[in-house]
Every structure is written in C-alpha cells, then in structure tokens.
C-alpha cells in the first residue's frame, strides 16, 4: 500500500471508529460487535505505525498513550467555574424561585437535570479539536488532565461540527458496574477501597499515568456551554440539544418545567427505586433557569450562580441488627468479612448483607455480632455498615476475630506484613479459590469465554467435570448435556467460546492465570518482554525487577506462582490443549536501544512525551516511570522534576532530546 492509499484508508478508519464510538457511548445504539470494533482499531494502529506521518493528535488511536507525568500543571479557567447552592427541601426550592422571579420581574421556566456525582471538568475545543481539559479545582485554577481525559471513549476528540472556539463543562463519573469491579479487584489485592464512585472517578482521573486512567472505565456527561464562537444558543434545553449534535454525551434525563410547582412534582417523582435503577450515581437534581439571557441578568454571588440550584437527595440509611459475620474467600485467598443483617429496605432494594471489608474496618468501628448498626449503600451500590449504635447494646454481643483456618479448606490463614487483608494459604487446594480463579480466568478482561459465568463454573466443579481452568479445554458435549439447563445449542455455543479463547493474546493468558498483583498492565509488560509463557516461567527475580513497573513484590509473586507444582501442571495441560502460550510478536526485530531502560522527565523540545516513548519502544528500548540503578538513561527536558535529582544521586547518565536522537541514529 502506498502513502496515498494508506492516507485514504486511515481517514476512513478514523471516521468509522469515531462513528461507532458515538453510536456506542452517546446514542447507546452499537451497530458492530466488540471484535469488529477491535479489528478496525488494530488496523488503524498498524497503518499509523507503518506511516508515522499520518498519525495526528485527534486520531482514535491516541486516546491511550504517553509516559507517566511527574505532576499536573495548573490551568487558570478563562471563566470562573462556580459551584451551586444546595436545596434540601421544598421550602428551599420555593425560596429560590421567589428570588429568581423577583430579580427577573416575570414568570420563569426551568430545566431539571440529573446531578451526576463525579468530578467536574472543563473541556476546550479549537477549530473542532479537543485541545485542553482541566479539573474544576477551586473554580479559578484547576489541574490540566488532557491526556487522561483523552482515554475516556465517550469524549469526542473532534466535534461533529467544527467550531472556532468552544469551552464546555461536564462531569467525569464511574459507572456502578465499573466501581464494583474496581473495588473487588482492590480488595483481592489487599489495597484500600474507594468509598464511593465519585472518589473512584476523581482518583482515577488524577492518575499521573494515563494508562491507569484508561483502565478504570470512566465515562462523561457534558451539560453546560461556557464559551462559544461560531454559533448561538438561547436556552439551556437548546444548549443540551446543541451539545448532543456536536457529539458530546448528554444525560438523557431532562425535564422542562413551566414553573416551580412542576419542579416540585418532578422532585417528588424521584423515588429511591428510580434512583437505584440508574447505571451511574446521582446525588440530586439541578434546577436551572432555561432562558440563558436571564443568566446574565440574575448574575452570581462569589460562590454560586443565582440562576441555578442543586436539590440534594436525603441520605439513604437504615438500622439493622448484625445476625452474624461470614467470610468469602476470593481467588487470591483474601478473606472478606460480610455482615448478615436483619432484612431492611434501602434505596429501593431489600438489604440483608453488608461488606465489612477487613479486620481493621471491623475493629475501627467496633462492630460486633448482635449490634444494631446504621447501614447505607456506598454510592447507592454496595451496602456497608457505617456506624454502630452503642446505646442499643445489651451485653450479649460477640466480638468477631478472624479465624486461624480457612473456612473453605482448613488451610492456615495469614496476614502478610503491610496488608490489610487476611489470606488463605491453601492455594489450588482451596475449593473457594479454585472457583473464583476459574471465574476470573473466563472473565471478559482475561480469556473472555462468553457464556461461562459463575453459576456454570460452580455447576462444572460440583459435577466433577473440571478441577482447574485448564480442564475447560477438555470438556466434551456429552459432559455438558448431563447438566441442568444445558441443551444441544447451549452446549455447542459454550464449547465454541472455549475453543475460540485458545487464540487469545499472551498478555490475556498471563492476566487470566491470576498471579497476585499482576494486573492487565503488568501482564502486557511481561508478554512484550518474554514473548512466551515458558520464558516467563524461567525468569529470575533479577530479570523480572529489571522490567519497567515490575517491582520486587510482583517478581516474588511470579516466581512463587511458577514454582508451585499444581500451577505447573495446569500450564502443561493448557499447552497440550493447544492454548496459545507465545506472543504473536515474540520474534520482533532488535533495535539500537534493545535492552536499554529510559526514564523521561521535563518538557522535551521538538517532541511530546508520547512521541519520545514511541521512538524508544520502536527502537527496542523500554520506558519506566521511576529511576533506579537499572535505569540506563534519564532523558531530561525543560523544567525537569525530582527524577533528575534521583538520577544524579545514583549516577545514571542524563541526556537531552538531542542525545536521545543521537542514540536512535546509531
């Protein structure tokens, strides 16, 4: 393919991918499968790698990339991003309406919108291209998070209609499903949990490494035009329609209310059940004057506009009695305590269980069996015990202690130093760990075996048809037909999905194995470096820790995993079953920087961080986020950070952008 043909195909692929992004994330009407979408993206990436001159900042391939940053730059907003005054009851809303009508001198129409519980951001577009994204901060100054925002698939990198200049305001949020999955993964790893989706969204967007942000499944709703050149909007309802036409994700809930009485009726219609049914968290409603011309008439205080008010939902809490505390054993052996409660209605559902996270949480709140406690849904999702009512105690309450033996297999339970979690040491001899491990192996982010959910895995284990993940590849149709709810078609579909998973990339297999602390990013690093499972299994701790982002703890976990005879037996069965154990690019040619580890710091003249990282990796080098004795070069640009000081302390060679170019030419 020559350059002209490549350019034409790249433009076509970009148009197709952005159209599918719009249909999926904005319209919620996907028209192709995930596999078809991935094929388009991989073709685009391959063409841009073959023809680097065709790569542009607004290409869909550029959503994820760039080296980790040392700190965020401060950005002054061109217009102050005010917060909102809160209303907690009908009287507050009536008083708001009275003030608005007094200042306006006439009846006023309102728009009611959902108050998304996330992190406010300002997005700037020039000539239709996304050029700058910043957090709200204190309203006047925020943090520049452009690279991180680009990783959110719902955010358009190019508007569907080019405008000279546009600044909009939106809310980055984490869907409930993503929040539950993130906390489950953190709990398994013994890491602190996020209290609610809002904290998770804020913490994920403010990661110095955009790749971590990309892994957190963030989404976005845009709800306000701050500054606009090249078009006009007259009402807030019209502004929302205008934003949707430009390709922004706009929340589907919107009600135009002719007066405050209609607003009050709509507020009453928001039952706990309705709120709980949403796939994302809202903590209230926002009532805005619809006529934008009135906004300047009404003005603002130093803190908030006079033309809007946030109605906050009352907290959803209930009291319940702790009937008992049970333990769930996860795939890595983490024991998670759960309170068994007297059933109570909360946020539209009946709650009879609540997470207690770990022993430290139980001790901190002094939760005992028999206590009367206050329960709430953290982010309307996970019920948790937030407080004990000590005056309800009778003296018969029991203090809970973590067991010395695993309730599932009887193996010893230990609490590793520096971790909040207690772990079962039974490994693959523990049936609970085997169950959770196979569920993880088949999950979407791992081997992606469609149709193999937790219930079917449990069924297969109970029937003795499988004992580990590798046994899945030896199942026969007659085995499945013996099970309940399995017919000819469902058995055939599952076996086809299992067979298809044999061709998954090596990085997915490494992640699927469930090695402690080896997430998707670490799995990718390991697959890229070693190229095969056999080479990874033979790697020493020293070889592993020489890799970017593989620390001593992960290295020890990898060695421990491959040193376990049961795990080696599983790997042998996978190999015999025909599961791909090698990377497709295992024989990639060496380059001038092969084996060299680089760290980037400061602003590099003539190239972006992302471009520098790509040049290094294409030449066979590795880019790390931190300086160590294993770092070969630190590439320092303007205004370098603490990494330069660390390099000097360790005697690591420091070069500039020209020095990097010279190495690349060797």
Curated annotation (Swiss-Prot):
Report the SS bond pairs: none
Alphabetical GO biological process terms: DNA repair; DNA replication
Give yes or no: UniProt keyword Magnesium: yes
Q: What class of enzyme is it?
A: ligase
Would you tell me the protein name for this molecule? DNA ligase
User: Could you give one GO CC term from the UniProt record?
Assistant: cytosol
Which residues bind Zn(2+) per the record? 406, 409, 424, 430
GO molecular function, a single term: DNA binding
The UniProt entry, under NCBIfam families, shows: dnlj, PRK07956.1
Q: Which reaction does it catalyse?
A: NAD(+) + (deoxyribonucleotide)n-3'-hydroxyl + 5'-phospho-(deoxyribonucleotide)m = (deoxyribonucleotide)n+m + AMP + beta-nicotinamide D-nucleotide
**Key word Cell membrane present in the record?**
no
Q: Which family does it belong to?
A: Belongs to the NAD-dependent DNA ligase family. LigA subfamily.
Species of the source: Moorella thermoacetica (strain ATCC 39073 / JCM 9320)
**What task does this protein carry out?**
DNA ligase that catalyzes the formation of phosphodiester linkages between 5'-phosphoryl and 3'-hydroxyl groups in double-stranded DNA using NAD as a coenzyme and as the energy source for the reaction. It is essential for DNA replication and repair of damaged DNA.
Q: Where is the active site?
A: 115
């Amino acid at each position: 393919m020559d350059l002209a043909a490549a350019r034409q195909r790249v433009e076509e692929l970009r148009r197709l991918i952005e159209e599918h992004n719009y249909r999926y994330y904005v319209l919620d009407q996907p028209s192709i499968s995930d596999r078809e979408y991935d094929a388009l993206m991989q073709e685009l990436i391959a063409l841009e790698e073959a023809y680097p001159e065709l790569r542009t900042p607004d290409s869909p391939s550029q959503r994820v990339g760039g080296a980790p940053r040392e700190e965020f730059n401060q950005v002054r907003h061109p217009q102050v991003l005010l917060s909102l005054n809160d209303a907690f009851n009908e009287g507050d809303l009536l008083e708001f309406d009275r003030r608005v009508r007094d200042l306006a001198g006439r009846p006023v129409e309102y728009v009611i919108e959902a108050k998304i519980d996330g992190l406010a951001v300002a997005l700037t577009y020039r000539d239709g291209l996304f050029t700058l994204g910043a957090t709200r901060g204190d309203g006047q100054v925020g943090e520049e998070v452009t690279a991180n925002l680009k990783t959110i698939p719902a955010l358009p990198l190019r508007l569907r209609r080019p405008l000279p200049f546009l600044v909009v305001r939106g809310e980055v949020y984490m869907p409930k499903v993503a929040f539950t999955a993130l906390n489950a993964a953190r709990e398994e790893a013994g890491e602190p949990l996020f209290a609610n989706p809002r904290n998770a969204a804020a913490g994920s967007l403010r990661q110095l490494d955009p790749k971590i942000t990309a892994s957190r499944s963030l989404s976005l709703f845009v709800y306000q035009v701050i500054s606009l050149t090249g078009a006009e909007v007259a009402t807030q309802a019209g502004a929302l329609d205008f934003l949707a036409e430009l390709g922004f994700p706009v929340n589907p809930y919107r009600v135009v209310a002719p007066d405050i009485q209609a607003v009050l009726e709509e507020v009453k219609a928001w039952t706990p059940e309705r709120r709980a049914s949403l796939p994302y968290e809202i903590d209230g409603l926002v009532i805005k004057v619809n006529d934008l011309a009135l906004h300047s008439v009404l003005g603002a205080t130093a803190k908030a506009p006079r033309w809007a008010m946030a109605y906050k939902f009352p907290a959803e809490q209930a009291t319940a009695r702790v009937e008992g505390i049970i333990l769930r054993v996860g795939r890595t052996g983490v024991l998670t305590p759960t309170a068994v409660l007297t059933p109570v209605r909360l946020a539209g559902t009946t709650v009879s269980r609540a997470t207690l996270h770990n022993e430290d949480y139980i001790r901190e709140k002094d939760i005992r069996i028999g206590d009367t406690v206050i329960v709430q849904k953290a982010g309307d999702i996970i019920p948790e015990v937030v407080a004990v009512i000590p005056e309800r105690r009778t003296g018969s309450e029991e203090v809970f202690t973590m067991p010395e033996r695993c309730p599932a297999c009887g193996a010893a339970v230990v609490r590793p130093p520096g971790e909040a979690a207690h772990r079962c040491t039974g490994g693959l001899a523990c049936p609970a760990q085997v169950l959770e491990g196979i569920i993880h192996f088949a999950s979407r982010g791992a081997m992606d075996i469609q149709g193999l959910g937790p219930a079917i895995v449990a069924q297969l284990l109970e029937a003795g048809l499988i004992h580990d993940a590798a046994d899945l590849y030896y199942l026969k149709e007659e085995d499945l037909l013996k099970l309940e709810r399995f017919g000819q078609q469902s058995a055939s579909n599952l076996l086809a999905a299992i067979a298809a998973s044999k061709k998954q990339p090596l990085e997915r297999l490494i992640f699927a194995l469930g090695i402690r602390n080896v997430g998707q990013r670490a799995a990718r690093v390991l697959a890229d470096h070693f190229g095969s499972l056999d080479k990874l299994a033979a790697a020493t701790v020293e070889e592993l820790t020489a890799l970017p982002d593989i620390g001593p703890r992960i290295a020890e976990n990898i060695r421990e995993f491959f040193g376990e005879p049961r795990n080696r037996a599983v790997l042998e069965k996978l190999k015999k079953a025909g599961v791909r154990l090698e990377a497709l690019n295992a024989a990639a040619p060496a380059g001038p920087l092969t084996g060299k580890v680089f760290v980037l710091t400061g602003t590099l003249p003539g190239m972006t961080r992302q471009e520098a990282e790509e040049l290094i990796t294409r030449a066979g080098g590795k880019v790390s986020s931190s300086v160590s004795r294993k770092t070969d070069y630190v590439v320092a640009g303007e205004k370098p950070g603490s990494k330069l000081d660390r390099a000097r302390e360790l005697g690591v060679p420091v070069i500039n952008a020209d020095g990097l170019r010279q190495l690349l030419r060797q």
